[in-house]
């Protein structure tokens, strides 16, 4: 789950970390009031969406008058902002962050993330901040520095010093950085984050180090114990189908194909998608209804899949281990009738009471195709979606 920039900075401030002074606003007048409260002669107005590339898309503006703050906020609020990192129709801007400007001398990059290879937290830094770090890593990988953290010790002093020297920091900036990095690590661990990215981390003209921007992603699997963070979820920033899946407590990822998939188990779901590709088709989604699938979750799955207008067929692949296939078959029949499914439905059942489940489907009087194998199911789905 992603946080907005203003929310991420609130998390930092709650841990006694310094950030630029800023106020979130949901209206143009509130933005103008925020600028007055902050004082000064210039402000930055930032659109709050869950995507990078806001600056190039016109979502970050430096202005020098209260009237300009109001007009920029009015131009952003209530409208979608399209960037290189989001969908073609963009994401809606419901909030802007009005911040003080800073006298910037240098822009750096700093992030903490889960490194899957080492199964530890990695600190990634670069002197080439303020730009797309992926491009920097691709074109000049030597400019990207990485330190792997011991989970028992966290970020150690020698690692802070090594990164600070490599980034060319000295004096107060060096001290600030070496204080900041262990604090960020503690924030990362204490909040079950999967990503904490500061781009840019700026060095000011008076040699202070501050996070000018901040992105946080919380591990979805830890939200049950991070209620304060879970309450910050903004479903307007994610795909409508994924928002519905969150509400139904099923795992859904939208894809670009036209064959809807509903499977119990993530591994089986990926194998199903692979077979669809091998048969020349393209899955429209990843949807895992879980090992303990019920008729209710099957009905919810249908509703979520059919929110995608590109879906031309639905493939259901259920292995009856914990759950009985006849119970799932009854749920499928109920869901098809309830939802009013108008696209072909192909079902592959295997496991406990699979034969009884297939019999129930055959006797339902509905246009449901019962496949004998996963390969056959994938082939039928591709043919029906063509």
UniProtKB/Swiss-Prot annotation:
Pfam families: ATP-grasp_2, Ligase_CoA. Keywords: ATP-binding, Ligase, Magnesium, Metal-binding, Nucleotide-binding, Tricarboxylic acid cycle. Mg(2+) binds at residues 199, 213. Its cofactor is Mg(2+). It comes from the Bacteria. Transmembrane segments: none annotated. PROSITE patterns: ATP_GRASP, SUCCINYL_COA_LIG_3. Binds 1 Mg(2+) ion per subunit. Belongs to the succinate/malate CoA ligase beta subunit family. Heterotetramer of two alpha and two beta subunits. This is Succinate--CoA ligase [ADP-forming] subunit beta. It comes from Thiobacillus denitrificans (strain ATCC 25259 / T1). The gene is sucC.
